[in-house]
Protein backbone atom coordinates (compact mmCIF):
# COMPACT_ATOMS: atom_id res chain seq x y z
CA UNK A 1 0.00 0.00 0.00
CA UNK A 2 1.34 3.40 -0.98
CA UNK A 3 2.22 5.85 1.75
CA UNK A 4 0.58 9.19 1.03
CA UNK A 5 2.79 12.29 0.99
CA UNK A 6 0.88 15.32 2.34
CA UNK A 7 0.86 18.63 0.51
CA UNK A 8 3.42 21.23 1.45
CA UNK A 9 2.17 24.03 3.68
CA UNK A 10 1.38 27.51 2.41
CA UNK A 11 4.54 29.57 1.80
CA UNK A 12 5.73 31.98 4.47
CA UNK A 13 8.64 34.40 4.67
CA UNK A 14 11.72 32.72 6.08
CA UNK A 15 10.66 29.20 5.03
CA UNK A 16 14.10 28.66 3.52
CA UNK A 17 16.23 30.61 5.96
CA UNK A 18 18.08 27.34 6.54
CA UNK A 19 19.25 27.58 2.91
CA UNK A 20 20.20 31.26 3.16
CA UNK A 21 16.89 32.82 2.10
CA UNK A 22 16.38 34.63 5.38
CA UNK A 23 13.23 36.69 5.81
CA UNK A 24 13.66 39.95 3.91
CA UNK A 25 16.55 38.74 1.76
CA UNK A 26 16.39 39.19 -2.01
CA UNK A 27 15.73 35.49 -2.56
CA UNK A 28 13.02 35.40 0.10
CA UNK A 29 11.31 38.47 -1.36
CA UNK A 30 11.26 36.88 -4.82
CA UNK A 31 9.82 33.72 -3.29
CA UNK A 32 7.13 35.62 -1.42
CA UNK A 33 6.05 37.50 -4.54
CA UNK A 34 5.23 34.21 -6.27
CA UNK A 35 3.63 32.12 -3.57
CA UNK A 36 0.50 31.09 -5.48
CA UNK A 37 2.25 29.55 -8.48
CA UNK A 38 5.00 28.14 -6.23
CA UNK A 39 2.48 26.40 -3.96
CA UNK A 40 0.53 25.04 -6.93
CA UNK A 41 3.70 23.79 -8.64
CA UNK A 42 5.17 21.87 -5.71
CA UNK A 43 1.74 20.42 -4.86
CA UNK A 44 0.77 19.73 -8.47
CA UNK A 45 -0.98 16.54 -9.49
CA UNK A 46 2.17 15.32 -11.25
CA UNK A 47 4.38 15.81 -8.20
CA UNK A 48 1.83 14.32 -5.81
CA UNK A 49 1.29 11.22 -7.95
CA UNK A 50 5.03 10.75 -8.38
CA UNK A 51 5.61 10.99 -4.62
CA UNK A 52 2.69 8.63 -3.92
CA UNK A 53 3.89 6.09 -6.54
CA UNK A 54 0.60 6.43 -8.42
CA UNK A 55 1.89 8.31 -11.48
CA UNK A 56 0.91 6.59 -14.74
CA UNK A 57 3.92 5.30 -16.64
CA UNK A 58 2.84 7.07 -19.83
CA UNK A 59 2.78 10.43 -18.03
CA UNK A 60 6.20 9.87 -16.48
CA UNK A 61 7.70 8.89 -19.82
CA UNK A 62 6.33 11.91 -21.65
CA UNK A 63 7.44 14.27 -18.87
CA UNK A 64 10.97 12.93 -18.58
CA UNK A 65 11.55 12.82 -22.32
CA UNK A 66 10.65 16.50 -22.51
CA UNK A 67 12.72 17.31 -19.43
CA UNK A 68 15.72 15.51 -20.91
CA UNK A 69 15.45 17.63 -24.04
CA UNK A 70 15.92 20.65 -21.76
CA UNK A 71 19.08 19.14 -20.32
CA UNK A 72 21.43 20.20 -23.10
CA UNK A 73 20.32 23.81 -23.54
CA UNK A 74 23.74 25.30 -22.69
CA UNK A 75 22.60 27.10 -19.55
CA UNK A 76 25.48 25.95 -17.37
CA UNK A 77 28.11 26.93 -19.93
CA UNK A 78 26.70 30.45 -20.11
CA UNK A 79 26.61 30.73 -16.32
CA UNK A 80 30.22 29.62 -16.00
CA UNK A 81 31.32 32.11 -18.65
CA UNK A 82 29.59 35.04 -16.93
CA UNK A 83 30.40 34.15 -13.33
CA UNK A 84 32.17 37.14 -11.72
CA UNK A 85 34.62 35.16 -9.57
CA UNK A 86 36.84 32.17 -10.21
CA UNK A 87 35.51 30.34 -7.15
CA UNK A 88 32.00 30.72 -8.53
CA UNK A 89 33.12 29.43 -11.93
CA UNK A 90 34.69 26.43 -10.19
CA UNK A 91 31.54 25.73 -8.16
CA UNK A 92 29.35 25.89 -11.27
CA UNK A 93 31.76 23.72 -13.26
CA UNK A 94 31.76 21.11 -10.50
CA UNK A 95 27.96 21.06 -10.47
CA UNK A 96 27.86 20.81 -14.25
CA UNK A 97 30.01 17.69 -13.97
CA UNK A 98 27.71 16.35 -11.25
CA UNK A 99 24.77 16.76 -13.63
CA UNK A 100 26.67 14.84 -16.30
CA UNK A 101 27.57 12.06 -13.86
CA UNK A 102 24.16 11.77 -12.19
CA UNK A 103 21.24 13.42 -13.97
CA UNK A 104 22.27 12.41 -17.48
CA UNK A 105 22.92 8.87 -16.23
CA UNK A 106 19.46 8.75 -14.63
CA UNK A 107 17.86 9.77 -17.92
CA UNK A 108 19.84 7.18 -19.88
CA UNK A 109 18.92 4.39 -17.45
CA UNK A 110 15.28 5.50 -17.50
CA UNK A 111 15.07 5.44 -21.29
CA UNK A 112 16.55 1.93 -21.28
CA UNK A 113 14.40 0.58 -18.41
CA UNK A 114 11.19 1.90 -19.97
CA UNK A 115 12.18 0.77 -23.46
CA UNK A 116 11.99 4.22 -24.98
CA UNK A 117 13.22 3.90 -28.54
CA UNK A 118 14.95 6.67 -30.41
CA UNK A 119 11.87 6.88 -32.60
CA UNK A 120 9.58 7.36 -29.59
CA UNK A 121 11.97 9.88 -28.10
CA UNK A 122 12.13 11.91 -31.30
CA UNK A 123 8.37 11.67 -31.89
CA UNK A 124 7.37 12.94 -28.44
CA UNK A 125 5.86 16.32 -29.15
CA UNK A 126 6.46 19.14 -26.68
CA UNK A 127 3.41 20.31 -24.79
CA UNK A 128 2.33 23.94 -25.19
CA UNK A 129 3.90 24.77 -21.82
CA UNK A 130 7.09 22.97 -22.78
CA UNK A 131 7.32 24.94 -26.02
CA UNK A 132 6.77 28.21 -24.20
CA UNK A 133 9.28 27.27 -21.51
CA UNK A 134 11.93 26.32 -24.05
CA UNK A 135 11.42 29.54 -25.99
CA UNK A 136 11.67 31.54 -22.78
CA UNK A 137 14.92 29.86 -21.74
CA UNK A 138 16.31 30.54 -25.21
CA UNK A 139 15.36 34.20 -24.83
CA UNK A 140 17.50 34.42 -21.69
CA UNK A 141 20.64 33.13 -23.39
CA UNK A 142 22.09 36.61 -23.93
CA UNK A 143 20.89 38.16 -20.67
CA UNK A 144 22.90 39.39 -17.70
CA UNK A 145 24.50 37.39 -14.91
CA UNK A 146 21.79 38.40 -12.37
CA UNK A 147 19.06 37.19 -14.71
CA UNK A 148 20.80 33.90 -15.47
CA UNK A 149 21.68 33.08 -11.86
CA UNK A 150 18.07 33.85 -10.89
CA UNK A 151 16.87 31.54 -13.65
CA UNK A 152 18.77 28.50 -12.42
CA UNK A 153 18.26 29.31 -8.76
CA UNK A 154 14.50 29.38 -9.18
CA UNK A 155 14.42 26.14 -11.18
CA UNK A 156 16.57 24.19 -8.75
CA UNK A 157 15.02 25.66 -5.61
CA UNK A 158 11.51 24.79 -6.73
CA UNK A 159 12.57 21.20 -7.46
CA UNK A 160 14.13 20.89 -4.03
CA UNK A 161 10.88 22.25 -2.56
CA UNK A 162 8.70 19.55 -4.10
CA UNK A 163 11.17 16.75 -3.37
CA UNK A 164 11.39 17.91 0.25
CA UNK A 165 7.73 16.99 0.70
CA UNK A 166 8.57 13.29 0.73
CA UNK A 167 11.53 13.76 3.06
CA UNK A 168 9.35 15.70 5.49
CA UNK A 169 6.78 12.89 5.37
CA UNK A 170 9.48 10.19 5.81
CA UNK A 171 8.16 8.36 2.75
CA UNK A 172 10.46 6.52 0.34
CA UNK A 173 9.15 5.78 -3.13
CA UNK A 174 9.06 2.11 -4.14
CA UNK A 175 9.09 2.70 -7.90
CA UNK A 176 12.79 3.04 -8.81
CA UNK A 177 12.21 5.76 -11.41
CA UNK A 178 10.24 7.82 -8.90
CA UNK A 179 12.79 7.36 -6.12
CA UNK A 180 15.64 8.16 -8.49
CA UNK A 181 14.02 11.42 -9.56
CA UNK A 182 13.48 12.42 -5.94
CA UNK A 183 17.03 11.48 -4.97
CA UNK A 184 18.43 13.76 -7.68
CA UNK A 185 16.62 16.72 -6.13
CA UNK A 186 16.99 16.13 -2.39
CA UNK A 187 19.86 15.31 -0.06
CA UNK A 188 22.94 17.06 1.28
CA UNK A 189 24.55 17.70 -2.11
CA UNK A 190 21.50 19.20 -3.75
CA UNK A 191 20.68 21.30 -0.69
CA UNK A 192 24.18 22.78 -0.72
CA UNK A 193 23.87 23.49 -4.44
CA UNK A 194 20.57 25.34 -3.98
CA UNK A 195 21.99 27.18 -0.96
CA UNK A 196 24.94 28.34 -3.07
CA UNK A 197 22.56 29.63 -5.75
CA UNK A 198 20.43 31.46 -3.19
CA UNK A 199 23.58 33.07 -1.80
CA UNK A 200 24.49 34.32 -5.27
CA UNK A 201 20.99 35.70 -5.84
CA UNK A 202 21.19 37.54 -2.52
CA UNK A 203 24.59 38.96 -3.46
CA UNK A 204 24.07 39.99 -7.08
CA UNK A 205 20.34 40.41 -7.64
CA UNK A 206 17.70 42.98 -6.84
CA UNK A 207 13.98 42.74 -6.33
CA UNK A 208 13.71 45.85 -8.51
CA UNK A 209 15.75 44.43 -11.40
CA UNK A 210 14.63 42.41 -14.44
CA UNK A 211 15.71 39.26 -12.60
CA UNK A 212 12.59 39.51 -10.43
CA UNK A 213 10.49 38.99 -13.55
CA UNK A 214 12.68 36.02 -14.48
CA UNK A 215 11.88 34.40 -11.13
CA UNK A 216 8.16 35.02 -11.60
CA UNK A 217 8.15 33.60 -15.11
CA UNK A 218 10.13 30.48 -14.20
CA UNK A 219 7.80 29.63 -11.31
CA UNK A 220 4.77 30.13 -13.57
CA UNK A 221 6.21 27.99 -16.37
CA UNK A 222 7.27 25.22 -13.99
CA UNK A 223 3.70 25.00 -12.73
CA UNK A 224 2.35 24.86 -16.27
CA UNK A 225 4.98 22.28 -17.27
CA UNK A 226 3.75 19.97 -14.50
CA UNK A 227 0.09 20.57 -15.35
CA UNK A 228 0.67 19.99 -19.07
CA UNK A 229 2.08 16.53 -18.37
CA UNK A 230 -1.50 15.30 -18.62
CA UNK A 231 -3.55 15.23 -21.84
CA UNK A 232 -5.44 18.47 -22.19
CA UNK A 233 -9.11 18.31 -23.09
Which ranges hold each PLM region?
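Short, charged/polar, low-complexity loop and linker segments
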Residues: 47-52, 137-138, 201-206
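Long amphipathic all-alpha helical oligomerization modules
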Residues: 188-216
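A cross-kingdom marker for long, charged
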Residues: 215-233
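Alpha-helical bundle segments that constitute or directly flank the non-heme di-iron/ferroxidase center
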Residues: 35-40, 54-82, 149-160, 226
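Helix-loop segments that flank and shape redox-cofactor active sites
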Residues: 45-58, 72-93, 141
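Acidic, low-complexity proline/glycine-rich segments
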Residues: 2-47, 187-196
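Extended amphipathic alpha-helical scaffold segments
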Residues: 41-42, 72-77, 105, 194-201
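Active-site-proximal alpha-helical scaffolds that flank and shape metal-associated catalytic sites
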Residues: 10, 18, 28, 65, ...
Amino acid sequence: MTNHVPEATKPASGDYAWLGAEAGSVADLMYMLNTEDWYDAINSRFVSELLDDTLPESILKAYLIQDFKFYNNGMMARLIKLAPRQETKDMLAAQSQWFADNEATYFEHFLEAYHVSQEEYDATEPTPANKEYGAYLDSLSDKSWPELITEICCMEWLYLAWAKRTVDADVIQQVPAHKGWVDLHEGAHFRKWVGDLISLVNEYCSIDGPEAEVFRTIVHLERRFFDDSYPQE
